[in-house]
Amino acid sequence: MARKKIVSGHLKNAISKDEHISVKFVNCIMRDGKKSVAEKVFKDAMELVEEKLGESSLKVFEKAIGNIRPSVEVKSRRVGGSTYQVPTEIKSSRQTALAFRWLLRFSRSRSEKGLSNKLAAELLDAYNERGGAVKKKEDTHKMAEANKAFAHFRW
């Protein structure tokens, strides 16, 4: 019998919430199934962050992700021949997934050498509430605010 609801995946290796988030992020970094490379990039980036700030790198990572996570987004709805951008709230899992995606996209587009350096720089920017990923979040929120009048089209 089919389930009506998707059961969230249980990660065997994740012991705490911190590790769960970092394992998920490593999986987002991974390309072509090369998990060991992704883990090395993440570990190196965290070491660089810890060197520069002198704080726990996982705390910095969590705060940076928290600064990037959007709470609303706009979805296109076609009503009576015209398309409206309708602001909708986002589930927690999607907020985190979008934050990961934006963080990686803007990390990869930076000019530093090596992905671990790029990721560390973008994490520090996100921690200090600046950088491309935070700007993307603000743009998304502005778009939702501008289209607030169409919120009644949500269903």
Swiss-Prot record:
Disulfide-bond pairs as recorded: none
Record's keyword annotation contains Metal-binding: no
A GO molecular function held by the record: structural constituent of ribosome
InterPro entries noted in UniProt: Ribosomal_uS7, Ribosomal_uS7_bac/org-type, Ribosomal_uS7_CS, Ribosomal_uS7_dom, Ribosomal_uS7_dom_sf
An annotated GO BP: translation
Entry annotated with the keyword Cell wall biogenesis/degradation: no
GO cellular component, one term: small ribosomal subunit
One Pfam family cited in the UniProt record for this chain: Ribosomal_S7
Alphabetized UniProt keyword annotations: Ribonucleoprotein, Ribosomal protein, RNA-binding, rRNA-binding, tRNA-binding
PROSITE patterns, sorted: RIBOSOMAL_S7 (PS00052)
Superkingdom, natural source: Bacteria
Similarity annotation: Belongs to the universal ribosomal protein uS7 family.
Subunit structure: Part of the 30S ribosomal subunit. Contacts proteins S9 and S11.
NCBIfam families reported in the protein's UniProt record: rpsG_bact
PANTHER family recorded: RIBOSOMAL PROTEIN S7 (PTHR11205)
Known function: One of the primary rRNA binding proteins, it binds directly to 16S rRNA where it nucleates assembly of the head domain of the 30S subunit. Is located at the subunit interface close to the decoding center, probably blocks exit of the E-site tRNA.
Protein name as catalogued: Small ribosomal subunit protein uS7
Upper lineage: Bacteria, Pseudomonadati, Thermodesulfobacteriota, Desulfobacteria, Desulfobacterales
